[in-house]
A protein has these predicted regions:
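Structured, helix-rich domain cores that form ligand/interaction pockets
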Residues: 1-340, 349-426
Length: 426
């Protein structure tokens, strides 16, 4: 294929589960100088919900103070909370880095990802297929999708036919749900426009901004010229405004995967090794693209339906693939896998280091910079080595690498030497 493929991959949702080392009500952030919007009511699981704002825009949403905690016979740990990046924050240059710093600086103990949405915006598929025609072929039964049997469709029923603009595969309880829809159409709906998404499109050369004019009729019957903007094919925008009716807006489509917490374990289809989905896996565009392709390999897999000589439908494993996205030959296929949730004791060295790091974080005798370092090490420890909750066989396959353990212990030794230099004991 000689044509250039323009596409834009992004986070669209990121939510994590944490535990507070100290209570963090909305007044804590207000006293630090943040603008905070507190909701008058909580959620079915949490008493308190508030949003931290920056320059009037939502930054991070916090849900805390659970109704049912384990100390009172409930299901949540004491201090449990959920943190979520706002949709606008997901489109920052480094949203995961910002999220990490927020978790560390404000004393949250990271436990794991509860939901992450990864999306790709594009004009056409990698071999030039029109997304609208792909939806039409799917609804007409010319192609079929592997996995995720539940499907929901949205479109319009017109005299000359039905036109589909959105499909969703998977159920509310699925580990992964898949969506394909016309993102331009969604943003054009009143009250749904998101300028930061359109800015990303321009940076990725999916479209260009065209200033337009249109006639507006006032309440007194007089008319005036007003200005607006449309998004046209990249490089075709004119410097001067043009009438709105002469502007042909380019449709940009989106494929989106929503991954829930029970899909946090991934298996390498070649080596059969298990890997944990963490913030480290989604902190760059290239990592997001790799994860998107892994998901697409399993959850956006289509077959072209063919028939036998007798006129019966051919078995799906004998039908040819309908390839939509091109992936590198160097990329390895990973598949989400739900693992048993039975508790398994962590290795003893992890428990010892974790307990001492917690004491460092909560001790009043420890300087702030050392407590922050301890919290950072603790986050990294749980990011790389949180293995309990898997079966014995799986834990043997997904064994600790010596490098990870050595690096973490070396950081811990440096921290202990800093304490000894200050003659602090804990």
């Amino acid at each position: 294929m000689t044509q250039t493929v323009s596409r834009c991959v992004n986070l669209d949702w990121l939510e994590v589960y944490c535990v507070e080392t100290q209570p963090r009500p909305w007044t804590y952030f207000r006293d630090l100088g943040f603008e905070v919007q507190k909701r008058e009511y909580g959620t079915p699981m949490y008493r308190e919900m508030y949003t931290i704002m920056v320059h009037g825009a939502a930054l991070i949403e916090v849900r805390r103070d659970p109704y049912q905690v384990k100390s009172q016979g409930g299901i949540f740990e004491d201090g449990a909370c959920h943190l979520r990046l706002s949709n606008r924050t997901c489109y920052y240059p480094d949203p995961v880095g910002l999220f990490r710093r927020f978790i560390i600086e404000h004393g949250f103990f990271y436990k794991g990802i509860t939901r992450v949405d990864i999306c790709m915006d594009f004009l056409h598929f990698d071999f030039g297929d029109d997304p609208l025609e792909i939806l039409k072929s799917y609804m007409e039964g010319k192609i079929s999708k592997i996995n995720q049997a539940n499907v929901a469709a949205h479109g319009t029923d017109q005299w000359d036919g039905r036109y589909w603009n959105s499909l969703k595969w998977g159920s509310e309880t699925s580990m992964v749900t898949t969506k394909m829809y016309n993102k331009t159409m969604e943003l054009n709906r009143p009250g749904h426009d998101k300028f930061y998404i359109r800015d990303e499109w321009e940076r990725c050369e999916l479209c260009s901004r065209q200033i337009t004019t249109y006639q507006y009729t006032n309440k007194d019957g007089t008319t005036c010229t007003r200005y607006g903007c449309k998004y046209v094919a990249f490089g075709t925008a004119k410097p001067e405004p043009i009438p709105q009716e002469q502007c042909e807006e380019v449709p940009i489509w989106r494929v989106e995967f929503s991954v829930k917490s029970n899909a946090r374990h991934w298996i390498n289809m070649q080596s059969k090794e298990f890997h944990l989905l963490t913030l480290n896996n989604i902190d760059s565009r290239m990592k997001l693209l790799f994860l998107f392709h892994s998901l697409a390999h399993h959850y956006f897999h289509f077959k072209t339906l063919v028939y036998t000589r007798e006129g019966t439908l051919q078995r799906k494993d004998r039908c040819p693939d309908k390839v939509l996205f091109i992936t590198s030959r160097d990329e390895r296929a990973y598949k989400p896998k739900a693992l048993p949730t039975t508790a398994k004791q962590a290795p003893s060295w992890i428990m010892r280091v974790t307990d001492e790091l917690r004491r460092l974080i909560t001790s009043d005798k420890v300087p702030d910079n050392i407590a922050e370092s301890a919290n950072y090490i603790l986050v990294q420890l749980w990011e790389q080595c949180r293995l309990w909750g898997v079966t014995k066989r799986d834990s043997e396959v997904y064994d600790l690498k010596a490098m990870n353990k050595t690096q973490l212990l070396e950081l811990y030794r440096k921290l202990r030497s800093m304490l000894e230099a200050k003659q602090l004991h804990f």
